[in-house]
């Protein structure tokens, strides 16, 4: 019976005899000794395996059964190869690190800028690709033209759904506040009313608007009660605000009265340090319209109204306005924003909520600023009115307001200029000063705070101590230091915007949309100075566009919007004597449809795409722009070439005319000039 072969190191058969066993054991010892010796050789001569073939031939060739007797076996060569690779990798890493270190310390300032620039381009590409993923996820609907909204939404404003808020249990005025839920996003295009007409140009449009452009009934016109509302008259298809009527004289007399109560001649409010006024419940803007001739800029805010809206009519006249309610939330303005707050029968019950509403207007009022209140409550004729008046009077005193004057139904208070007033009050009198954690300079619709804000700000400067308008718009070195800026920065920004505005204005022509587009030349007529009136700057930065338009004597006012996604320059913009607001562009803007003649976005797309968390798509932003834009209104987008191209592709869904134009001063940026068509709804 044959036994199975057993192979050892030499591969020989193991015999059953004892002699063979002893021989085998002796051979094993010899082989182990030889193996140990070979390993030692391997360590001393690690590259010896490269010459294993020559060595084996030198020592007598192959072993039994075809297995080599070479001391450098296959396993040894494998181990040595791995060792060699490890050493090589270590050397490569060391050389790479040394080279990188040498390159880092030897790189010049210009090359560092070049590398940073390339890094930014790679970062922008990555973010753009991520945005693309979100757009592609829309599937076949990505390039589909949006449908038009139904007729019921002609004047719809997202986030202000009073009936829905009432159903959710909001009451006591809270139902008028702003609530942006998941259903706030609008996915259709607003059509103008059937009889809509392009507004008359400024200044004619200040006094005459088309009745069909706004939602108001004849009864609402007749029943208008306050001074500023009584100026309105219905004439055929027009609503007239007669500047030469007796009612206009009444507004002028009212303005003179306030000036006298403050202690200035006529209504030269600039002399008292007043440039910007927040007009709460502004009627239809006649107070602000009158003050424009005095270089006073008035921002109107009022609750959302489904019909007869004060904000809608004021904007239609070409005057600054926005929907704003502070029943439960703080206004989207920084602390210390306005020189004066005005309330002419504005419908706010200042004695409610234990004075919380008065605390909010104190927050946005600058030191030394004025609060003007005209109401029957100030001249009480019964116990209830007396009780409510006494509360407001005493509360105003407790927050360090001084009662300057009272005539008829009008009262004027002046805010303290000294923060020590708050610490000198008796214990328990008035609300306390906000702690550092609660004193947010620029809140964004935060709940109302029962504490006095702004006292820690470096911007606590009395209005009398500020530079008078119009010099205020060009801040000096000391003023700019409050915002961490140097005069050279603002000066360079101003020069760039002067050039940019000249270029923008020349491009607002149908010539660029022709079959053979060209830049309008010197021989082409320039667009008139009053071609635009209401301008929205979606990323205002320092307010440079606003300043350049005024310097170029264009008849515009600008709503300067500072996105919540970027640096907050809104305090500086307001301190320059402009108006503006904080806003998140992934949410609807608080205004009515068909508000603006021009919407401008400088590097807004770059700002939005750089956010780590995307809450909206590009089409969402452009759909909102379409809602805000008047028929035949213009859009100017300035951004990187890649993002401008994505924007151009997106707006095909909006049915706009569009043209991409190169920027002469920058090879990496492009302009996208668009115009919204005047598409009419078919009459039913």
Curated annotation (Swiss-Prot):
Residues 108-684 are lumenal. Residues 1-86 are cytoplasmic. Its main location: Golgi. The chain crosses the membrane at residues 87-107. Disruption phenotype: Deformed dwarf phenotype and reduced cell adhesion. Hypersensitive to imbalanced C:N ratio. Ubiquitous. It holds the Pfam family Methyltransf_29. Residues 19-35 have a biased composition (Basic and acidic residues). Changing residue 560 to Y: In osu 1-2; loss of activity. Co-expressed with the galacturonosyltransferase GAUT8/QUASIMODO1. This is Probable pectin methyltransferase QUA2.
